[in-house]
Amino acid sequence: NSSDAAVLTYAAGSSLRVKLIDSDRNQDASAVDQVTVNLTSETETTAESLVLTESGDNTGIFYGTYSFNVSSTASSSNSLLDVQKGDKLEVSYTDPSDDFGNSTLIKASSYYDVTLLSGTLATNMTKANSPYLLTGDVTIPANYDLEIEAGVEVRFTPLSDDQSSGNDKNRVEIIVNGGLDVLGTASDTVRFLSNGESPASGDWYGIRYQSYPAGNVSYARFDHATQMIQYQNVSYNDSNQYSDTLKIRHNKIVNSGSGISISSVRANMSIDSNYYEGSGSFISAYSNRGRSDANFLFNVRGNTSKGASIYINEYKNYSDNYEVKVVIENNHFTHGISLSSTDRVEIKNNHFEGGISLGSWSSYDGIKHVLISGNTIMMSRGSSGIYESHVINSEIKDNQLTGYNFRSTGISLNQSNAKVSDNVISKFGTGISVSTDFNHPTFDSLLRNTIVYNGNNGVYVSDYGRVLAQYNNIYD
């Protein structure tokens, strides 16, 4: 700028200014010299030439300015740099002789008409002011409900945080103490991404709802985050226990770490029709207690996840009158799922490429009711297709289970009461195993199952297990 300070963005209506220091280009100590640099934008990729003039005799400091032209198309003959709002700008200069006598190409970049944000934010993020560039943590204060409009692009400076705050002092995060709704549409999504030259997973932290998680996220794409969304630490008091359902729908999470983390939250959740691809967990939910005055619903429907797994632990209402219900339905997962310490579970019409693990280590935390129906389970490694432990009442029906290299068990029931019917179980080491101990008597029904091509056993009953087995088709 005119004060010789580097700028991250040029305001609309301003001019580009370049400063170059190179004492080698001071070829005449008694005269003013000139050098040439090249300018490009994302709109005009063919370089415009800008002649820089030395600031005085024998200074080796060169300056030049160039005007912008806001246009959706480039023109190489107008002596203007054609730009659109949010364009990245680049200046390049070839130093004929660096400190080692070599020719070196040097580049610097800035942006045109980007809205910079850092610190407290109490206004909506609009498409008219997009794109936004967050240079430090942005905090939405309590009692404010903000919106991010459809079509907004939110960029983050990589691996830096000028606020030095939040969970990660070296990465930018959006911290929500009030409410935040991301309101993308199918035709006009919201984008969150790194602003780095070579963007990578973990360049920025994520969105973190804390204290009072009021907000929904729809039709957004997340790139380069450490953790897409965290809902955490809702105070267990009357003012928070009536939170509306939190909805995460129709989002795409790629080139990032983990997807959705939910901890210490008392609110209904709906996670629908999202796409996740990454090395972390698509959903991790733990230490969430149900409301003491109402039922509590956690829905996961219509999602595609190409991640590591889904973990849901302690989604439970410790009350005789109300319960937590977890529904996993119509999803396509290239992994398995693990659930423990909840009240009621329904897992229906999903595709898994990993096992379903349900239950807990003790009967006190056992799941009350389980329905597993209509799923396709294709194992990609040697573990159980369905494993239940300390489940009080379970129905497992109409599932297709295919093992991996004749290893482990298709359906394993430990200290659980289950009705297992009309399943097809093949290519495991054991088709169905049942076990319990003297202190936890159970009774399991095995009806009309097809148990074929398993390596060792069709049905294996051990310890104090008891079964009623009728009309099953069992053969190698």
Feature annotation, model-predicted:
Residues 14-18:
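Structural beta-strand segments of beta-rich domains
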Residues 11-13, 120:
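Solvent-exposed, conformationally flexible loop/turn segments
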Residues 1-11:
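Short, compositionally biased P/S/T/A/G/V-rich stretches that sit at domain boundaries
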Residues 79-106:
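Ser/Thr/Pro-rich, low-complexity mucin-like regions
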Residues 29-56:
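Extended low-complexity, serine/threonine- and proline-enriched intrinsically disordered segments
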Residues 110-476:
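Beta-strand/loop edge motif enriched in small/polar residues
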Residues 21-28:
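Short amphipathic, basic-aromatic surface patches that mediate peripheral association
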Residues 55-78:
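Aromatic sugar-binding surface patches on proteins
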